[in-house]
A protein has these predicted regions:
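Catalytic-core regions of core metabolic enzymes
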Residues: 1-689, 697
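A structural signal for short, well-ordered beta-strand segments
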Residues: 73, 675-677, 690-692, 810, ...
């Protein structure tokens, strides 16, 4: 999250080119040429002993001779000199450096040198960066780019050059174009933090091959995506591609899960990437998912409809009033419907009349206009007419419009006109629909992430008991637990298993079966045979003692023949579950090398290919996230929506997934969990067979997770002055209803002091932003009083840290009728202790001069108070280091 040095990299005031040259095709020549041609406003300092001047600019023989320290240095010399030059730049006080090339063997030393001098590095093996708004072309690219609102971050120089060339042809602009190279120091997450606050950037596009820190990426991406759309293309989906790119192995569905969890949108290929660039550059914000299609032919409209149907898109329904107006305005032979086929002889006048009527209606959320080449109706003329209509119509600048002028040669001029007018334009109907559905999916993801989760009922968790059982098993040397051994651990988290007994031989199996009643199931116990099905190690519906004995002996015989060296630890005996009309599912937790623990859901079966057969989510899960996973599984046909007799209980399965998530989050000793099959029968879910792989764990249990979980350890019971006890705890997404009720019990005056304006009502989006926080970046403590199985919020204090984790802005609010009980002070003390322990240096806030109680409290807590009467505010600052010392 660190932003140290990024300002000097992305907004440099001066640049030194180390190894500048007058020899064409040398890196130092190309970099100087591009810097000067780009129109950079600050001094450019070529450093080379070989030339007195480079491209007309006075050169300096070495770094020590520079007249001042540059903000940014670019190493264009032989890689063997990198370390010495970087050390000299650091000693001279340079803040940032772009390293164009360096072998892997240098990486460790280069990073150590940069950290010693508190420098930031872009690269190595970076194409460089372009910032058109500053006239900055610090790259190898010979292609000039226009100013725009789209930022592009790439981990591939080849993809960067391709996008630059493509954008030049379409006269597409960028706010930043950054090629990361090997990301030795500066990485995607830091740039996302910077661009999220950049006023010139309205959308961000990422090309990724790997991640160095998944947790930082998810955190930064989630924060940035709340304000700006972010699209991602990720290569290396197959093992062969991963080997080619030399990237970390990992499940591709895990990337999907992380991208969706952060509120981003993934595009799958280069074709979609180009459509995405066009969309992000020009498309206006989407209000909904209803699409209206206008075309001058049925065939291209049908292609668009097919693509819309395949992506589960939604057509708009025209009102009777709109249909009547269209009938009156258009020729009688035109069928008024959606899509609206104006026929192949549609003139520009027909397009204009249609647009005027549709723009005045509220029947759609996005408008797609298709034009096929026609001798009777030239495309350029219709394009001019459409652009002028959009410009003059009062609602023109608010409509989400997509244009598709089909064909190549005859439509070039029309597409150029649309690009100049800032209207998104695409070559094919399918590409246009793909772009539209990208924005629909992005909007849907953002909306889902802000939905208030339901509070699940009867959630059980006995973390201490589960830990004790796991530690005991590890101390005994166990590395894997089967269904019988794992039962008490699952029961500690409310997960139901079928009662299981262990039999050493066939006679004991018969004895157990007689005790529990028939029919029964027998299952092999062997740590050396990963899949019981390999030796037919599961026998079901055994109804007599003779059947049990024969089945047990048969299992033992098959193991001796197929796996003679395998250890046999007996048999598991279970009452036969009622499978009639039930559905068999599978829930697996595995550790991904990039994103840590993953929760996977699929159908039961012998073969298990999670990339194809399961949907994947990152823990921790709440009820909303678990429900999305189940619904995603149904939509992608990874699980069935119903069995032969019963519909799948989505709420019940969601609650089970939350319980599994809690178990995994709380117990880092768990390496892998496989519940297979999980029998779903109406509202009952029973784990019939479970395998749990375990190992000792030493360290921060949260560090293995890509998303920081709810910090239970920060909960604290506090007694107020009136003797009432309340719970201080971090805020939860489920707190939104209680927070709304709390705000309703705060006076307008107190709300004015807190928000510096009159607040009539908070929207759901406002409250979601307050409750659905990233605990890595923000903390909010609520004081909660429990009454009759309900909770009410009495007060809230909050701190939002900057990306460097140096400063945090704080606020505190207490229910107006509870002042004087010491609640505000206790909440502030809790927040101060947390921010200090979290490594922050300063806590800052503002209030109004007439908020005397807050000013007095701040003074008591050691804040510096700066009364600014002209501004009408009081600045409050607490030095946390001094606070710690005192």
């Amino acid at each position: 999250m660190s932003q140290q040095g990024l300002e000097a990299l992305l907004r440099p005031k001066s640049i030194a080119v180390i190894g500048a040259s007058m020899k064409p095709h040398r890196a130092g020549y190309l970099m100087m040429r591009n810097l000067l041609a780009g129109g950079f406003n600050g001094p450019v300092l070529p450093v080379t002993p070989a030339w007195k001047a480079v491209l007309g600019v006075m050169a300096w023989p070495d770094i020590a001779s520079l007249p001042f320290t540059p903000d940014l240095a670019i190493l264009c010399t032989n890689a063997s000199r990198n370390l010495a030059l970087l050390d000299a730049l650091g000693a001279n006080g340079c803040k940032t450096c772009i390293i164009l090339s360096a072998p892997t063997s240098q990486h460790e030393e280069l990073l150590a040198c940069a950290r010693r001098h508190k420098m930031r590095l872009l690269g190595p093996n970076s194409l460089g960066l372009l910032a058109p708004w500053q006239g900055l072309n610090a790259s190898f690219s010979p292609v000039p780019i226009k100013q725009g609102k789209l930022a592009f971050i790439s981990q591939s120089a080849a993809v960067s050059n391709t996008i630059l060339d493509w954008a030049q042809q379409r006269e597409m602009g960028f706010s930043y174009f950054i090629a990361l190279g090997d990301s030795l120091d500066i990485d995607v997450d830091e740039l996302l933090d910077y661009l999220a606050r950049d006023s010139k950037t309205s959308a961000i596009l990422l090309y990724l091959e790997q991640l160095s820190d998944a947790r930082r990426f998810v955190s930064a991406a989630r924060s940035a995506s709340r304000n700006k759309p972010i699209l991602v293309i990720k290569s290396g989906r197959s093992p062969a591609a991963q080997r080619l790119l030399n990237t970390s192995a990992g499940m591709d569905p895990a990337w999907d899960a992380a991208i969706q969890r952060a509120g981003l949108l993934r595009v799958q290929d280069t074709h979609e990437l180009f459509s995405a660039v066009e969309t992000l550059s020009h498309m206006r914000p989407l209000r909904g998912d209803r699409l209206m299609i206008i075309s001058n032919g049925a065939a291209p409209a049908a292609l668009a409809l097919d693509e819309l149907w395949s992506r589960n898109g939604k057509l708009a329904t025209l009102s009777e009033e709109t249909c009547l107006q269209l009938r009156q305005a258009l020729p009688a032979h035109i069928d008024i419907a959606n899509p609206l086929d104006l026929c192949d002889d549609a003139s520009s006048e027909h397009y204009v009349k249609t647009l005027d009527i549709l723009l005045a209606s509220q029947d759609f959320d996005a408008l797609m206009v298709i034009h096929s080449p026609s001798a009777a109706a030239p495309g350029t003329e219709s394009a001019h007419a459409l652009i002028e209509t959009i410009k003059r119509h009062p609602r023109g600048r608010f409509v989400t419009l997509l244009t598709n002028w089909c064909g190549e040669f005859s439509s070039q001029e029309a597409r150029r006109l649309f690009s100049e007018a800032g209207l998104p334009t695409y070559r094919t109907p399918e590409g246009t629909i793909t772009a539209f559905m990208h924005m629909v999916e992005y909007r849907r993801n953002q909306k889902q992430l802000r939905e208030t989760p339901a509070l699940p009922s009867n959630l059980t968790s006995n973390t201490a008991e589960a830990h004790n059982l796991l530690q005991q098993a590890i101390a005994e040397g166990a590395t894997s637990l089967d269904t019988h051994e794992v039962q008490p651990i699952l029961h500690a988290y409310g997960l139901h298993t079928l009662p299981t007994w262990i039999a050493g031989d066939s006679a004991e199996a018969v004895h157990i079966a007689e005790q529990i009643g028939y029919p029964v199931a027998l299952k092999l116990r062997s740590p050396d045979i990963p899949h019981k099905s390999d030796v037919q190690g599961v026998m079901l519906y055994l109804r007599t003692a003779n059947e049990v004995q024969q089945a047990a002996n048969a299992i033992f015989d098959r193991v001796k023949m197929a796996w003679p060296q395998a250890r046999i630890h007996g048999l598991l005996v279970q009452s036969m579950a009622n499978r009639a009309g039930a559905q068999e599912l599978r829930v697996v937790v595995e550790h991904d090398p990039v994103f840590g623990p993953l929760i996977m859901l699929g159908e039961g079966g012998v073969e298990w290919r999670p990339e194809e057969q399961a949907v994947v989510a990152l823990p921790p899960l709440n009820m909303n996230l678990a429900r999305y996973l189940v619904i995603q599984g149904i939509k992608q046909r990874k699980i069935r929506a119903r069995s032969a007799q019963h519909p799948l209980d989505i709420v019940g399965l969601s609650q089970l997934l939350v319980q599994v998530s809690n178990l995994i989050v709380d117990c880092p000793e768990i390496q892998r969990l496989d519940i297979h099959p999980l029998l779903a029968s109406a509202s009952e879910f029973t784990a019939l067979d479970v395998t749990l792989d375990i190992a000792p764990f030493d360290g921060d249990s949260e560090s293995r997770l890509a998303v920081r979980p709810y910090p239970h350890q920060l909960e604290e019971w506090v007694e107020m002055k009136n003797g009432d006890r309340c719970l201080f705890r971090p805020i939860l997404p489920e707190d939104e209803p209680q927070l709304r009720q709390f705000i309703a019990q705060v006076t307008k005056e107190d709300l004015y002091y807190r928000y510096f304006s009159e607040i009539n009502e908070f929207t759901h989006e406002d409250l979601a932003n307050m409750t659905q926080i990233d605990y890595d970046r923000e903390m909010a403590f609520v004081a909660v009083r429990r009454l009759d199985n309900t909770e009410e919020i009495l007060g809230v204090t909050r701190a939002i840290s900057d990306p460097d984790n140096i400063d945090a802005e704080f606020a505190v609010l207490v229910r107006s009728d509870l002042k004087g009980l010491g609640l505000g002070r206790r909440l502030m003390e809790k927040l101060i202790a947390y921010t200090r322990d979290h490594g922050l240096r300063r806590l800052n806030g503002i209030t109004m001069p007439n908020n005397r109680s807050m000013v007095a409290l701040a003074r008591k807590l050691g804040f510096q108070v700066d009364i600014q009467l002209e501004e009408g505010i009081v600045g409050l600052t607490l030095n946390l280091a001094q606070c710690d010392e005192s």
